[in-house]
């Protein structure tokens, strides 16, 4: 099964070279994108992850406990969104770790493992090397995310002391998302104010050179839909993907 559509590599290379990022529309083949969306919406056993500013406390709520929590109880766990002026970092979103071994991946979410495998194929790593101009990448780490009401990812640079990250790699898989709902990706200026805002667009890949200031704005409290994505990094170290 083919995973992605044909890409205009020369055009993407030029844009990345000029701006430090590219937005690749319709990355996955239609049937693959639809299957991934269905898995994310209906099949994935989500965990809830959050980090409080000031205390730095990180919490994880497992899928069984998350199912038992009421919306009000979940809201109490969501921290206040940090800003650059706070000199701190906060987040709140649901996450699922894709097993790298297909045999370890339950059938209802097998399509996510298939995508993870393709992202780490020689073919795809070669495409990213061409686009970014950096062939040292050996892995595309990939997790699933779900942002619900009040969830956010505060301003940060994507720097890591333990990893050599070349580019952030985020594939949006939300349908009919509206910008006024929040949950928008944004590049920020030096004052941490959003200056380039990119609302989630189904089956669009955001690939950008790191480090770079960015965030995901808070999802508004009235929103009843979920924002889905596959996120990770094109990086040097091979840590998470094992065949």
Feature names for model-found ranges:
Residues 1-205, 211-243:
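Fe(II)/2-oxoglutarate oxygenase catalytic core
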């Amino acid at each position: 099964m083919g995973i992605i559509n044909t890409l205009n590599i020369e055009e993407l290379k030029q844009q990345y070279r000029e701006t430090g990022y590219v937005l690749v529309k319709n990355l996955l083949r239609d049937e693959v994108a639809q299957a991934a969306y269905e898995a994310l919406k209906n099949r994935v056993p989500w965990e809830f992850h959050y980090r409080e500013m000031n205390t730095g406390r990180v919490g994880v709520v497992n899928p069984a406990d998350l199912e038992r929590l009421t919306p009000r109880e979940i809201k109490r766990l969501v921290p206040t969104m940090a800003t650059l002026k706070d000199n701190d970092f906060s987040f709140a979103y649901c996450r699922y770790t894709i097993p790298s071994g297909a045999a370890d991946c339950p059938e209802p979410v097998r399509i996510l493992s298939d995508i993870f495998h393709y992202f780490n194929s020689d073919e795809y790593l070669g495409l990213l090397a061409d686009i970014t101009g950096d062939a040292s990448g050996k892995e595309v780490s990939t997790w699933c995310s779900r942002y619900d009401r009040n969830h956010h990812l505060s301003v940060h640079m994507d720097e890591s002391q333990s990893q050599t990250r070349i580019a952030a790699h985020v594939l949006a898989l939300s349908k009919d998302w509206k910008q006024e709902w929040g949950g928008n990706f944004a590049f920020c200026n030096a004052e941490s104010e959003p200056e380039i805002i990119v609302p989630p667009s189904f089956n669009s890949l955001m690939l950008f050179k790191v480090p770079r200031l960015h965030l995901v704005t808070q999802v508004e409290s009235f929103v009843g839909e979920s924002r889905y994505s596959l996120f990770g990094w094109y990086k040097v170290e091979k840590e998470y993907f094992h065949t």
